[in-house]
């Protein structure tokens, strides 16, 4: 932090629309892993048809410039880890990464999920 400097921020509050109407609202607190956490939640929901609980519960993957390592969350399959290492990635397994709060809006109601990685979190909608 210094005068005339902008703080680094990865804030990514996300609203996904379909035909102009909201279908998914999600976000994540934290730092550098916000963008990949939110992206993986959106991809899991839209592309893989997961509900918010399933989308949040899958193991996460993150890479940034420094440190030059691929961080993966515990629970990623050993086969996948072996493939990544064979491709030359320096893989670092972490117990947890990122947290989300997500609400999915469907025709039959609202489905919210508070990521269990944050035991104090709540997902609220009205």
For each of these PLM feature ranges, what is it?
Residues 75-126:
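Cofactor-centric catalytic regions
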Residues 1-94:
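Proteins synthesized as precursors that undergo proteolytic processing into mature forms
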